[in-house]
Amino acid sequence: MAKSNTIQIKLVSSADTGYFYVTKKNARAQTGKLEMRKYDPVARKHVAFREAKIK
């Protein structure tokens, strides 16, 4: 059986609230760090979320 191309990553809030999302990305197609603007319910606004490894 072939190894999957997708890996699970954690998107951590840049507002330092401790809030994070867990999502998947294609490791071969996207080699850089993922960054997207999403809603942080602790800060109650949209902020940048950056990729971090799941420990």
From Swiss-Prot:
Annotated protein name in UniProt: Large ribosomal subunit protein bL33
HAMAP family named in the record: Ribosomal_bL33
Ranges that cross the membrane: none
GO molecular function: structural constituent of ribosome
Keyword annotations from UniProtKB, A to Z: Ribonucleoprotein, Ribosomal protein
GO biological processes: translation
Record's keyword annotation contains Nucleus: no
GO cellular component labels: cytosolic large ribosomal subunit
InterPro entries: Ribosomal_bL33, Ribosomal_bL33_CS, Ribosomal_bL33_sf, Ribosomal_zn-bd
Gene3D superfamilies the record matches: Ribosomal protein L33
Similarity remark: Belongs to the bacterial ribosomal protein bL33 family.
